[in-house]
Structure formats: structure tokens, C-alpha cells
């Protein structure tokens, strides 16, 4: 992995950061997935770009070696949940978008499963240590959930939300009950 004294960033920012169309699309993605900054988008984009680059490099290999490596890459991406079926092809890898990786983040899955009312509350529950994956407390909202881990996402056993999860009605004041 290299010398720890020479740590490098794992993402690559946009070449032209001030294009209005790019700014609007990034802002929409940040709102949809509850991201804190654009670096999280750029990291997802870089990871997906790396997978697409691997798929393109497979096309140049001899057929025997290509079949082995293609099967390995497809298996890995299926286990990560980025591909829909095990019978996917390289064309499916080349069609990956950063949204497909953002859908696999723990924050997004916690919200989609209904453990949190909003995507922002999902992030807060994760950071505060209320969410566990397979019994292990995970405090990183950007944790990429594998396909086989998806069913084991729940509240951490010692969390106060384990027996009383947040629901849509909590925190709202009924105007009729308030009685001005």
C-alpha cells in the first residue's frame, strides 16, 4: 500500500469544478444521499471509474486470461451489490454510475430499511454508534455494505433505539393537542 509517510488522497476532484450543470447535479446527489461534502461524491466517482477502467483493461487480455479475471471482477462487484445478477457482463460494469455505489453506503441502506426517518438521521444514528452490521458497531456512514451483510443491519444491542426505534410520528407536535 506504500509508505505511510506518503499518504495520498483516494479521490480525484472534477477537472472543471465550476460548471453550473456539474454543480447542480452534485448538489442534487448530496441532498438525495445526505452527503456532508462533495469529496464523498468524488470518492464514489473515483472508485466506480477504477472499476470501469479494470473492465476496459480486461477487453485487451487474451481470451483465456480474460475469462478468469472477468469472472473474478464480476464476482467481486456482485458481492459488493453493485451488480444486479451473477450473470452480469462487462457491459454492466462499464455502465456503472456513482449513484450505484452511493446506494450501497450504510447511511443510504439504513434510511431505505426504515431504521431512520430521514437520510440525515440515518447518518447521525450511525455516527453516534446506534447501528450495527452483523452485530458489529459501525460508525462510518460511508461503509460499503456487502450483499450478504444487508439483512444483518439493525440497531446495536445496547442502543436505546433497539426497543424503541424512531418512527415518523415522533417529534411532531399536534396542533389540536397544543391548545393555543
From Swiss-Prot:
Keywords: Ribonucleoprotein, Ribosomal protein, RNA-binding, rRNA-binding. It comes from the Archaea. Transmembrane segments: none annotated. It holds the Pfam family Ribosomal_S4. Residues 155-180 are annotated as: Disordered. InterPro entries: Ribosomal_uS4 (IPR022801), Ribosomal_uS4_arc (IPR022802), Ribosomal_uS4_CS (IPR018079), Ribosomal_uS4_euk/arc (IPR005710), Ribosomal_uS4_N (IPR001912), S4_RNA-bd (IPR002942), S4_RNA-bd_sf (IPR036986). One of its GO terms (molecular function) is rRNA binding. Residues 104-166 form the S4 RNA-binding domain. This is Small ribosomal subunit protein uS4. It comes from Metallosphaera sedula (strain ATCC 51363 / DSM 5348 / JCM 9185 / NBRC 15509 / TH2). The lineage of its organism: Archaea, Thermoproteota, Thermoprotei, Sulfolobales, Sulfolobaceae. The gene is rps4.
Amino acid at each position: 500500500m506504500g509508505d505511510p509517510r506518503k499518504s495520498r488522497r483516494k479521490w480525484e476532484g472534477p477537472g472543471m469544478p465550476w460548471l453550473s450543470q456539474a454543480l447542480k447535479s452534485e448538489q442534487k446527489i448530496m441532498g438525495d444521499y445526505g452527503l456532508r461534502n462533495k469529496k464523498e461524491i468524488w470518492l464514489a466517482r473515483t472508485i466506480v471509474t477504477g472499476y470501469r477502467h479494470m473492465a476496459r483493461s480486461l477487453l485487451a487480455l487474451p481470451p483465456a486470461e480474460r475469462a478468469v479475471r472477468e469472472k473474478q471482477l464480476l464476482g467481486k462487484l456482485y458481492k459488493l451489490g453493485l451488480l444486479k445478477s451473477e450473470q452480469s457482463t462487462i457491459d454492466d460494469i462499464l455502465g456503472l454510475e456513482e449513484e450505484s455505489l452511493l446506494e450501497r453506503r450504510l447511511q443510504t441502506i439504513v434510511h431505505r430499511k426504515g431504521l431512520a426517518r430521514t437520510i440525515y438521521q440515518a447518518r447521525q444514528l450511525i455516527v453516534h454508534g446506534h447501528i450495527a452490521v452483523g452485530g458489529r458497531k459501525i460508525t462510518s456512514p460511508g461503509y460499503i455494505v456487502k450483499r450478504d451483510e444487508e439483512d444483518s443491519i439493525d440497531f446495536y444491542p445496547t442502543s436505546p433505539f433497539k426497543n424503541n426505534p424512531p418512527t415518523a410520528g415522533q417529534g411532531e407536535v399536534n396542533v389540536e393537542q397544543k391548545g393555543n
